[in-house]
Amino acid sequence: MHRYRTHTCGAIRPSDVGQTVRLSGWCHRIRDHGGVLFIDLRDHYGLTQCVIDSDSKAFKAAETARSEWVIRIDGRVRTRPAGTENAELPTGSVEVYIDDLEVLGPAGELPLPVFGDQEYPEETRLKYRFLDLRREKLHANIMKRGAIVDSLRRRMREGGFFEFQTPILTASSPEGARDYLVPSRVHPGKFYALPQAPQQFKQLTMIAGFDRYFQIAPCFRDEDARADRSPGEFYQLDIEMSFVTQEDVFQAVEPVLRGVFEEFAGGKRVTKEFPRITYADAMLKYGVDKPDLRNPLIIADVTDEFADDAVEFKAFKGVIKSGGVVRAIPATGAAGQPRSFFDKLNDWARSEGAPGLGYIVFEEEGGALTGKGPIAKFIPAAIQARIAEKAGAKAGDAVFFAAGTEAKAAGLAGKARIRIGDELKLSDTDQFAFCWVVDFPMYEWNEEDKKIDFSHNPFSMPNFDRDEFLALGEADSEKILGIKAFQYDIVCNGIELSSGAIRNHRPDVMEKAFAIAGYGRDVLEEKFGGMLNALRLGAPPHGGIAPGVDRIVMLLCEEPNIREVVLFPMNQRAEDLMMGAPAEATPKQLRELHIRLNLPEKKA
């Protein structure tokens, strides 16, 4: 017999009745029924009920056991008495009568009980993460994460991709967030950086003549935590392809994500064909560049309607005269809501920094659509009808309005759309709704610096005739601001899973792109000289994307916080409470690295 086990705690079945088995695991729960002890023994694979009474020679040893002690038991499998079965457990029809028990690892008083669903402060959970991970839900999340990563790898290989490993110690990159720096002992005063992403390496892999790259890549960014973003470290499915168009990337990536989500969605529907939504349409119709398509509400522009001379609502008139816009957010079925529903939405809008949300409630009177509400009296019936038509509103619906600069109106309307959809329970949450957002603007006007600047990714290829692009001058600012980039995002349920792009592989086009944004060739050479040199030595057209693994797992585990799907996460202050990181270095370590500390004064 094996030293520790013949079976796992999830493997015992009725077919094993009568056999002598050996199990090892943790005491999940112990129940004393007066001379009879029931020990629920748990391991990675499941749980088996074990029972012992005073007739057993191991009874005294069993009496000493406590929650989370690690024990080994030998015993006979028997059928549970009628009426005591547990249909929720695969082992629920049998139990093991204990003949022998050995304590393998006693446990002290637990700072975090494993049995039960009691919530504990995050600080406690992270400090004792190894205990937290014994809890069923979190344990299942981590196992599901591993299965999802396996599925991603398998699907990528089936798609003709080859897995590469890129360096972890590299040079500091000027784009994105702050770098994590690693001092060099051999080169005093110089530092490596942990990669924010393997962006340049994966492009160099294409320039090196490889064709289809992927990597489950660790990425390191010194940035603040959010619910959907871990501080410090995260993983992404990094992808790059040579000789491809934007559509080729979509055709390669879409089946991978759709397949993984269908495999792990737990019965939820998954979008079959991911719709393409332009950035302009996303901002207009959804108020955000990562639309949640589970919500059926679509925002409409009603600036022209409120600009009509017959409309007397001065608040919106003033906004329009100053160059602003008015957006309409439909609220399906809201006419039947009490006044408090509308008052709460206005209070919420004021908490967002807006003066409020004007609204019209539409009802049918005499066979015609009639608008009521605080601002309806300022708007003629004919224009109300136009507003209702644009917003897709019918009798029994309401329409809310957001006014301001285009950016502010879009932002408020987008948030209101989500809030209204949630309040009215309009969203179909039994699905994973995907889309591609495409045609991002290459440039935008920087009002603060009064100059043209990059809008999103400066290294994406402009969707513009090359010769015409190279000929652009200072007088072409209107044309420049209209240039779109071959850049795309993939969005699921309102969460951005990834950004990607067809790369700018032409040095002359890249130099011109940066020159338009006010960066001289010397700046480009200084910061990206290595990449430019490679591009000058025969670079293929290439493009890629990098969906976030942590966010994919978070969605599929239906967790609101990314720390629930990471094995050993940091807290929001980028601290590892369990291992005590970051930690002070010893004077000897600092001397070896030629580093002297110059710390800020502690605040009183």
Curated annotation (Swiss-Prot):
The gene is aspS. One of its GO terms (biological process) is aspartyl-tRNA aminoacylation. GO terms for molecular function: aspartate-tRNA ligase activity; aspartate-tRNA(Asn) ligase activity; ATP binding; nucleic acid binding. L-aspartate binds at residues 175, 221, 456, 503. GO terms for cellular component: cytoplasm. Belongs to the class-II aminoacyl-tRNA synthetase family. Type 1 subfamily. It is found in: Cytoplasm. Its EC number is 6.1.1.23. Transmembrane segments: none annotated. It catalyses: tRNA(Asx) + L-aspartate + ATP = L-aspartyl-tRNA(Asx) + AMP + diphosphate. Residues 199-202 are annotated as: Aspartate. The lineage of its organism: Bacteria, Pseudomonadati, Pseudomonadota, Alphaproteobacteria, Hyphomicrobiales. It holds the Pfam family tRNA_anti-codon. This is Aspartate--tRNA(Asp/Asn) ligase. The record marks 33, 83 as: Important for tRNA non-discrimination. It is an enzyme of class 6 (ligase).
